[in-house]
From Swiss-Prot:
Modification Citrulline, positions: 27
Pfam families linked: IL8
Lineage: Eukaryota, Metazoa, Chordata, Craniata, Vertebrata
GO biological process: adenylate cyclase-activating G protein-coupled receptor signaling pathway; cell-cell signaling; chemokine-mediated signaling pathway; chemotaxis; immune response; inflammatory response; positive regulation of release of sequestered calcium ion into cytosol; regulation of cell population proliferation
Disulfide bonds listed in the record: 30-57, 32-74
Family per similarity comment: Belongs to the intercrine alpha (chemokine CxC) family.
A single Gene Ontology CC term: extracellular space
Tissue localization of expression: High levels in peripheral blood leukocytes, pancreas and liver astrocytes. Moderate levels in thymus, spleen and lung. Low levels in placenta, prostate and small intestine. Also found in epidermal basal layer keratinocytes in skin disorders.
Endpoints of the signal sequence: 1-21
UniProt name for this protein: C-X-C motif chemokine 11
Function (record text): Chemotactic for interleukin-activated T-cells but not unstimulated T-cells, neutrophils or monocytes. Induces calcium release in activated T-cells. Binds to CXCR3. May play an important role in CNS diseases which involve T-cell recruitment. May play a role in skin immune responses.
Principal cellular location given in the protein's record: secreted
Naturally occurring in which organism (per UniProt): Homo sapiens (Human)
Subunit description: Interacts with TNFAIP6 (via Link domain).
Length: 94
């Protein structure tokens, strides 16, 4: 292989290794659209999940699963109820 061919091959390999580390999209997809609700009736809560910032979404998301197949709701992470849920989940996990 000529020197020119080797230089091109080396350039392609270097570009491929650099490009591999870049994310496909600048902003990922969050599970919650919009700010979310301020509160949910405690009696209706079946499960609470917290999604911390990651490559997919750059904000904290508090997702509440409701009883009786009523679906899920996103709580505003700045609301009082969401802050209490975050504290409880963090205490439980540590």
């Amino acid at each position: 292989m000529s020197v020119k061919g080797m230089a091109i091959a080396l350039a392609v390999i270097l570009c491929a290794t650099v490009v591999q580390g870049f994310p496909m999209f600048k902003r990922g997809r969050c599970l919650c659209i919009g700010p979310g609700v301020k509160a949910v009736k405690v009696a209706d809560i079946e499960k609470a999940s917290i999604m911390y910032p990651s490559n997919n979404c750059d904000k904290i998301e508090v997702i509440i699963t409701l009883k009786e197949n009523k679906g899920q709701r996103c709580l505003n992470p700045k609301s009082k109820q969401a802050r209490l849920i975050i504290k409880k989940v963090e205490r439980k996990n540590f």
